[in-house]
């Protein structure tokens, strides 16, 4: 992903998800988020129709299903379908509500990861309405939460939120803020093209 190789990243994500035995995921709660890597790889590369075509995980895996609906909400917002985006967000919330409050994915609490997901979805809806300030505020909130996550490799969130906030700041004409954000990202993720471009 960091090198911008979308086909390779998507293939690897699909392969990883396919190799996860359902029995293992049932026995080890907190790892079903891996099932959503393919759809979030498509989000990462802006493949909105691909996001909507991606099959949902098995319903018993509530976290993976929730974040997959968030991915679909983002895609619908990017395609200008705000009503559909709202429906997808509602489905995400229904699935998040199925998870115990103390749930973890990897090393991090689902409450933190769900906050990032909700913020991304709300930001895309705000962007679609032309409300740059609200979109930037939501993404800034997500960056703050992401910065507080415990380290894991790969990260327990699918990609750096700064890579969404930076381009939005540029679109809004806030070039100095975008530059500062990208410089901060390069300290966390050296030499990544998402921040260098």
Residue ranges and their predicted role:
Residues 3-4, 45, 79, 129, ...:
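Structural motif corresponding to the intra-repeat A-B loop/turn of tetratricopeptide repeats
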Residues 16-28, 54-63, 93-110, 143-152, ...:
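Solenoid-like repeat scaffolds
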